[in-house]
């Protein structure tokens, strides 16, 4: 099949790569325009655009796609069989959805209709979901409201964070999308619609994964310890707090259970009721901080202008004192 691939971040590359290596022909890639992201106002290409350039594939980076007559006519002229969309970043209008022969399909990283929207992986971790997955969806004009052709569910591991879970789902999306393309090609002249599953028939709650905002990254020590842990995983590696006026990225923590607190090595912890207080500094354990509920151990962090540090090294770097306060 002749395919146009739509994608922008690194997450999308596994799917683009698997189709380039398949029997199908990727005749073009659509990605977001270059953006100014570094000092000196230098324009930076999206990861997908950079990858497509290495593969010598024609690239389109329209500033707008809705009512863009020139771009739409260009797409129509390519006689494309299938549009594959994975983390492109914009909702495609009806006039584009209707162009390809086999339709326009999206791989969404959640168990729809849970976590429709821009940041499903982040919110599945932040909210402590036990499972997630990938759904291959026939796109319509709504926000991730299309019918599903395929879906695969995976367990979210206790040690998963945004990086590790994104990698798993990126690989799963690629494999599932390739399988979906074969199904569409084989059954196109049969009743493809009969193979689709409507989201409202799955009995799942509809939730929305809004875009992550700058304010979301700040750790609120007044929350429950488990919620703080989930947030750090879901926003890895950008969750942060303020220590002595400097930004401190919190990369990994451990929640101390009630039983663990009874261990003799923690008995000398200062008793502070205020969240965000350093309760103890234990060389072989880490920095212990109070929350609304259980204390947490700061295992890995990155102080502004410094390298990532853990446990003993982090203690030597920060030189924290019992009773100091981490601000939110």
Swiss-Prot record:
Reactions mediated catalytically: L-methionyl-tRNA(fMet) + (6R)-10-formyltetrahydrofolate = N-formyl-L-methionyl-tRNA(fMet) + (6S)-5,6,7,8-tetrahydrofolate + H(+)
Binding site for (6S)-5,6,7,8-tetrahydrofolate: 110-113
Record-level Gene Ontology MF annotations: methionyl-tRNA formyltransferase activity
Keyword Transferase: yes
KW Iron-sulfur (keyword) present: no
GO CC, any one term: cytosol
EC number: 2.1.2.9
Top-level division of the source organism's lineage: Bacteria
SUPFAM superfamilies cross-referenced by the UniProt entry: FMT C-terminal domain-like, Formyltransferase
Keywords: Protein biosynthesis, Transferase
Family classification: Belongs to the Fmt family.
Alphabetized PANTHER family for the sequence: METHIONYL-TRNA FORMYLTRANSFERASE (PTHR11138), METHIONYL-TRNA FORMYLTRANSFERASE, MITOCHONDRIAL (PTHR11138:SF5)
Function, as annotated: Attaches a formyl group to the free amino group of methionyl-tRNA(fMet). The formyl group appears to play a dual role in the initiator identity of N-formylmethionyl-tRNA by promoting its recognition by IF2 and preventing the misappropriation of this tRNA by the elongation apparatus.
NCBIfam families with a match to the protein in the record: fmt (TIGR00460)
Name of the protein described by the UniProt record: Methionyl-tRNA formyltransferase
Organism: Prochlorococcus marinus (strain AS9601)
């Amino acid at each position: 099949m002749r395919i146009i691939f739509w994608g922008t971040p690194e997450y999308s590359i596994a799917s683009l790569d698997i189709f380039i290596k398949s029997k199908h022909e990727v005749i073009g890639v659509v990605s977001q325009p270059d953006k100014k992201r570094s000092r000196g106002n230098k324009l930076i290409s999206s990861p997908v655009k950079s990858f497509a350039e290495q593969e010598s594939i024609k690239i389109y980076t329209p500033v707008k796609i809705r009512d863009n007559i020139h771009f739409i006519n260009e797409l129509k002229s390519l006689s494309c069989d299938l549009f594959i969309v994975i983390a492109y970043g914009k909702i495609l209008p009806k006039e584009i959805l209707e162009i390809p022969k086999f339709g326009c399909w999206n791989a969404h990283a959640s168990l729809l209709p849970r976590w429709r929207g821009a940041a499903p992986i982040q919110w599945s971790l932040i909210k402590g979901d036990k499972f997630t997955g990938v759904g291959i969806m026939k796109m319509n004009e709504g926000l991730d409201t299309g019918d599903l052709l395929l879906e695969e569910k995976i367990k979210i591991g206790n040690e998963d964070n945004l990086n590790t879970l994104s990698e798993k789902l990126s690989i799963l999306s690629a494999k599932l999308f390739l399988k979906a393309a074969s199904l569409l090609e084989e059954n196109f002249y049969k009743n493809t619609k009969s193979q689709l599953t409507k989201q409202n028939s799955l009995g799942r709650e509809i939730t929305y994964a809004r875009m992550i905002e700058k304010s979301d990254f700040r750790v609120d020590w007044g929350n429950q310890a488990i919620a703080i842990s989930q947030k750090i995983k879901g926003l890895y590696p950008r969750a942060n707090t303020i220590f002595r006026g400097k930004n401190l990225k919190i990369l990994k923590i451990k929640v101390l259970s009630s039983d663990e607190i009874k261990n003799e090595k923690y008995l000398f912890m200062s008793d502070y009721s205020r969240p965000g207080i350093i309760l103890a500094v234990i060389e072989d354990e880490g920095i212990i901080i109070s929350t609304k509920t259980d204390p947490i151990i700061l295992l890995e962090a990155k102080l502004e202008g410094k390298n990532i540090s853990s446990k003993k090294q982090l203690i030597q770097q920060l030189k924290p004192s019992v009773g100091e306060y981490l601000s939110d």
